[in-house]
Amino acid sequence: MKVLYTSDLHGEIHLYHELLSLAIASSSEVIMVGGDLLPSFPPTKRYEDMVPNQKTFVDQFLSPLLKRVLEATSVRQIFLIPGNWDLGYPHLFKESMEGIIDLSQRSYRLKNGYELIGYPFVPPTPFRPKDFEKMDDKEAPWPPQKNPSYIRSSDQTDQLTPIDPYPYLRGRETIEEDLNHLPKPLRQKRTIYIMHSPPFGTRLDLIQGGKSAGSRSIKTFIEEHQPLLTLHGHIHESPEFSGAYLDRIGETLSINPGQFTWASRDVSKLHAVTFEMEKIEETLMHTCFPKVRSD
């Protein structure tokens, strides 16, 4: 089964058009998008306009495009999770769309017997939207927070509620706790996890200065459960700084394709990978990086 994976498109229309072109060129059967699908900031740069702008993007562009992908290509299923900027994500599923599947904290068994499991949350960032942020674990350090930060009041309203991020995040379950409650697959060696945050301390989570910004709990989860493959995003620039878009944690292959990084200033080329699910390493290709070894 041919898979196309990307992440962090942030409402960039030209990247979505490239996604459609790549789906056609690669004859992909499944598309997976690992979060941050929607525009981060509205043209007004006002947080109160963020959700209405994202909903407009969904209605006028994204939903029609995804339907077009399913109609005009060999793609039969599109799996999505939100990222930390996707406060308007529930609007994508206001109506059922055949072939477009919300994988957030859910599992899905494909016709070939492989299982997909999605997880959207990331450790605290310096940014203000907090719907999809949680403490990594009770001891993990945080970056300085901006006060006020914002959460969406509910899925039924566009209103954002200002919050003090420190008590808000301390009052939520941690990523570590969440991961223990994810659906349990039948066989880890035939399971692919789509997680917006990359694992900490790998070649997939490097930011400027060589610091790691991924999730310690996600790395521990991968070490302990050893799934076939994990797919990530969030840290756009990591492949640029580490020189690699894949890493190995035990026997698990982990991938962060990156996206239009500030280091290269290349915003015109979609960062994505394609592969055959039954022989991932032999067929893995990146749109911007040469084929590399994972060991």
Predicted regions, residues:
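Extreme N-terminal starter segment of soluble prokaryotic enzymes
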Residues: 1-4
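Active-site environment of divalent metal-dependent phosphoester hydrolases
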Residues: 10-14, 38-42, 80-92, 108-110, ...
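Core catalytic region of metal-dependent phosphoesterases/phosphodiesterases
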Residues: 13-111, 257
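Proline-aspartate-enriched helix->loop->beta-strand connector
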Residues: 28-32, 218-232
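Active-site-proximal segments of metal-dependent phosphoesterases and phosphodiesterases across multiple
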Residues: 38, 45-59, 186-226
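A short helix->loop->beta-strand "cap" motif at the edges of active sites that frequently abuts
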Residues: 70-78, 226-228, 249-252
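Binuclear metal-dependent phosphoesterase catalytic core
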Residues: 107-112, 216-224, 238-295
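Active-site-proximal loop/helix segment associated with metal-binding centers of metalloenzymes
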Residues: 114-208
